[in-house]
């Protein structure tokens, strides 16, 4: 359904959904960067001056977590994988009504190609090095 007005005001962009999968509401298109326009009229240039056709866009990486790992998160992640995204599921930031449901969702997601990660794994991968300007701040949050 609709997002809470107070939360919506804090966000640049929001997605209201009624389907269990947010991809059904256009999440994949929303996350994909816009295509870059081609410059000039290629037919007007000699072949040796024409720009090569753009390579296929790199697979975007989506980091996902949520409350109902076995319902909305599962269906959204599976649809994003089908839509050619690389999906990282932050397992320690996911829940379900029961551990069995959560673990079954993780098993299914791993089998479909999702990367199962933890909050710390994501944080340190994004930092890349202890020389990152935010390293000490992140370390303080984790400890």
Where are these regions (language model features)?
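Active-site alpha/beta core segments
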Residues: 1-72
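Active-site acidic carboxylates
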Residues: 1-17, 78, 86-89, 97-98, ...
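Fold-independent oxyanion-binding glycine-rich loops
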Residues: 17-18, 67, 91-93, 119-120
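Short hydrophobic alpha-helical module
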Residues: 33-37, 79, 83, 112
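Short coil/turn connectors at secondary-structure junctions
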Residues: 57-60, 83-86, 112
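Short glycine/serine/threonine-rich phosphate/pyrophosphate-binding segments
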Residues: 69-76, 83
């Amino acid at each position: 359904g609709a997002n809470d007005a107070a939360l919506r005001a804090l966000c640049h962009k929001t997605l209201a959904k009624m389907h269990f999968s947010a991809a059904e509401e256009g999440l994949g298109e929303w996350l994909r960067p816009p295509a870059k326009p081609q410059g000039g009229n290629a037919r007007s240039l000699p072949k040796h001056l024409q720009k090569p056709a753009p390579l296929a866009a790199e697979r975007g990486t989506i980091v996902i977590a949520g409350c109902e790992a076995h319902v909305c998160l599962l269906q959204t992640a599976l649809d994003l994988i089908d839509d050619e995204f690389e999906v990282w599921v932050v397992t320690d930031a996911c829940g379900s009504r029961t551990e069995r449901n959560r673990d079954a969702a993780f098993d299914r997601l791993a089998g479909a190609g999702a990367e199962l990660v933890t909050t710390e794994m994501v944080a340190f991968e994004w930092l890349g090095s202890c020389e990152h300007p935010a390293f000490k701040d992140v370390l303080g949050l984790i400890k």
